Amino acid sequence: MSHDLDLWSSPSTPQRLWSVRKRDRELAAELLTLGEYGCEIQLFRDRGFYSSKRFETVDRALRSAERIVRALQAEGWTRST
């Protein structure tokens, strides 16, 4: 017997893209794929949720995350992963 709940798909497990440190602060980015709804970049500050943005494609999300980390590195943040 099929249930309506069987049709519900949950997001994938987030994939860590990078983390950066500056003094005692940490910022991290994760990629969350949402199936037919695209994907999302989630930012965490000191291990707490900070912000997210949804994208139509993984490629666009990855390019955005790379721009963010490059800008942070230009401001003195050090990449740790």
Name each region found by the language model.
Residues 37-40, 59-68:
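Short, surface-exposed linear segments at secondary-structure transitions and domain or protein termini
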Residues 26-50:
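Short aromatic-glycine-(Arg/Gly/Cys) micro-motifs in beta-strand/loop hairpins
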